[in-house]
Amino acid sequence: MEKLAIVVPCYNEEEVLKIASEALRGVLDDLIHKGKIAEDSFILFVNDGSKDRTWELIEEEHQAHPVQVCGVKLAGNVGHQFALTAGLITAMDLSDVTVSIDADLQDDVAVIEEMIDKFHNGCDIVYGVRKERKTDTFFKRTTAQGFYKVMEMMGVKTVYNHADFRLMSKRAVEQFSKYQETNLFLRGMMPLIGYQTDCVYYDRDRKSVV
């Protein structure tokens, strides 16, 4: 049975971290109970130089749940994309498949099971895609559309309405780790990896877990 690592980049997440940990541990427990992932699957919180109690709370969660929760403490604030990359590279040697998700859990954790199912059916990358942007303001919706159009004009392949909520197989992460980019934009790099891909669709919660 494949070992899953859920990678969660964190910056000043003290208000949501314990709630996120509980929710994600629930996902692990459910998938383990259904026989879809290994019993030693885990959550990897990546502390991106937080200035609040984020790291302290990660340590507390690890002490309370040593098998399911672990953490990586970066030396300073390197930004979301680099923190996520650090988590993926760390998880690469410790797991067979990864799922990345933000700590606020605005992305629907319920579709992680569908991602795992698609992985078992041969997919190396599964994108989490928002069904629509009804909860966004007019400004955010318009600028998002403009962003994707600019990316398309520049020849950058992206999946519309996908951020960084995705599943990656071990070999997909290994291939990604070979890229030597200084200005990381993971959404634009994923299609370059190749391998079989698919999408899962969900409604994004405009509220965080708090």
Segments the model singles out, each with a brief description of its role:
Residues 1-30, 34-38:
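N-proximal low-complexity "stem/linker" segments adjacent to membrane-targeting elements
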